[in-house]
């Protein structure tokens, strides 16, 4: 049995005039994440974890922020494409665990919706996808409310014989 672990991380600055999207869920807040795409840090971290576990590079290699094709892109679409590429490389996704770090807004009311969206995008049952919401206890740039970060790990299993 060939198992692979991948780890992903992303952070984006909070700015006025943009919607806040995490895990494909639009969250009511006076600021949103700044980025080339919709800046969904949670989807980006999971996408990076998948690519890393499959040794396929990272999100920037596949969806560069210098490419206008991805300007304003829905990160769930990018995640689904990452899933397709990982499966094409011969891997099945076993599970995903993730953490969003944000001082504000309070994310707990949205975690189950995020989990549901992500499970659908990953082609997994929700019991194989976990989303946790944490604060940084008012420490650093995240604690000052300057941005939001996300971490993710995934486990892949190869369908190929070694």
UniProtKB/Swiss-Prot annotation:
EC number per UniProt: 4.6.1.12
GO molecular function annotations of the record: 2-C-methyl-D-erythritol 2,4-cyclodiphosphate synthase activity; metal ion binding
Sites annotated Transition state stabilizer: 36, 135
InterPro entries linked: MECDP_synthase, MECDP_synthase_CS, MECDP_synthase_sf
Sequence positions that bind 4-CDP-2-C-methyl-D-erythritol 2-phosphate: 10-12, 36-37, 58-60, 63-67, 144
Highest taxon of source: Bacteria
Cofactors: a divalent metal cation
Keyword Repeat assigned: no
NCBIfam families, sorted: ispF (TIGR00151)
Known function: Involved in the biosynthesis of isopentenyl diphosphate (IPP) and dimethylallyl diphosphate (DMAPP), two major building blocks of isoprenoid compounds. Catalyzes the conversion of 4-diphosphocytidyl-2-C-methyl-D-erythritol 2-phosphate (CDP-ME2P) to 2-C-methyl-D-erythritol 2,4-cyclodiphosphate (ME-CPP) with a corresponding release of cytidine 5-monophosphate (CMP).
Protein name: 2-C-methyl-D-erythritol 2,4-cyclodiphosphate synthase
Organism per entry: Laribacter hongkongensis (strain HLHK9)
Lineage, top ranks: Bacteria, Pseudomonadati, Pseudomonadota, Betaproteobacteria, Neisseriales
